[in-house]
């Protein structure tokens, strides 16, 4: 039976250890403990009775290499390639590695000195070149022992080749263990992952991509998804569109699951009978989609905090960089570069507000910073008045020394003093966000991003469906206004106009010409003009190439315009109905509460609050969860690894007749580039959803990929 209303899934909050990132971290921790199943990390779900561990496949059963003795935690060296370094970086800091016994971490292809009394943990891709380097390390006796961990499955042929190399060099005894870890993805947040496949849209859509290249690329994607499923530890139901890349990946994934059942067997016995029964009752749902079904979302302007950081600042791998300008007493402007690492799993403010509209984040930052500052000062005053002195330790930490002669108050004072370091850390985090909010606000206000956001949202939700001429006029007015936005902002608006409406090509050409004329270029495409900077000229050339490519796809019916897709979708507006009063009240509050530099421009972004419409990926996932008739639930292939007949495929005519298990959690995966705005939209509408893509890109980075396909 199809259900109605919003998807209802079990809340992840009930199990803080259930996130994909936590499970991946547990696997990496076991790897650093030399894959010793008796070594349990804090929060680990290791079960020593199973003899096998999550996301770790011991292929010592090949009996070609000796097994090492059980190893307890000890000092060791971590050696990885660039791919595996990207996997480790979001999970463990340098200090985290040291707490796990890692004294040194080095790239496999770097020059490395011998340390013969310390074991080495290798974490690398299973390639011939990597195996050759490892075999050479063993032959030279660089380390006491080599614990080999491959990010995905090591082919038998490569294993045999490696075995011959170490036998020839008489260094077999150096190889302690060989493991397939199945960790071939980068987990940036608790339920956000990427396969780290750069320039993916170009590769998958370039007409010069050969059949062999495409086959290899889809195999890599399937390998990555197998790693994700292995980490989750439950067989999912797989849904995907018929034909094209999604079906190719889904069928490869089904075959991999069928060929390697042992990677799921190891999860049996981890939990008690009750929880195991509950897990068996609910099934993960993996939805595989193609980027080409929605090309608007990756270029559209957004309104949420995290997505705006990724859009207007330099943001990659949880690190944000920007320039901050300050003015000294003499009126001289000083520019300073700032860089911060953001971790939503360790930063309460970021965790709460990354998916919220930007103005809400501003308001909350001002309120929380004011409260924390007030509480910190109160505790300091009480502590000093109670005979407690404050000093700074050599490490820079704040330390409080009680005066032994003072009758120091009481347990309440001691408790308050004990809480002060945590308050100071929270204040520091809030001040970091104040700086980031200021940098984002500067860009948002100077580029008038709210106007682009509002118009693009109206286009994408079909508001202009019955008045295409007005759509053209409004777009033309904004892209020809020299005071509004950057060149890239205008290009993005034109792309949304192209994809979200049925406007003829002549209308799009007219809008493009109007924009070019306003920038000082002739419609015929003359050289650079004094009115436009060289950087903008490059952005213009790139943007026009992207528009040309998308117009060609649209004319060939190779992509679907969003006006058709969204015509049956109701826009989901937070606070709809009384949104005007709510906006004015909240923005007035934000103006009063936000710290000084932020408050100046707050009024200019009020339109970015309250209007959250469902993106295409969100609609598809909701329809599949709710089993809604007449939607993708009737069209997407239904593949179940637990069904032995027909390769696990259920005929679409039979899908509504079978008893389907309730959905436990959802993995929504996009083949091609993904975006933080898509990640936010999914999480705003659906609980317990894991979002993944081949790569996370900013809107301008996606434009660059589109342009290269002209």
Each predicted region: which residue ranges?
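Extended, well-folded catalytic/binding cores that form a central cleft or groove in large enzyme
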Residues: 2-710
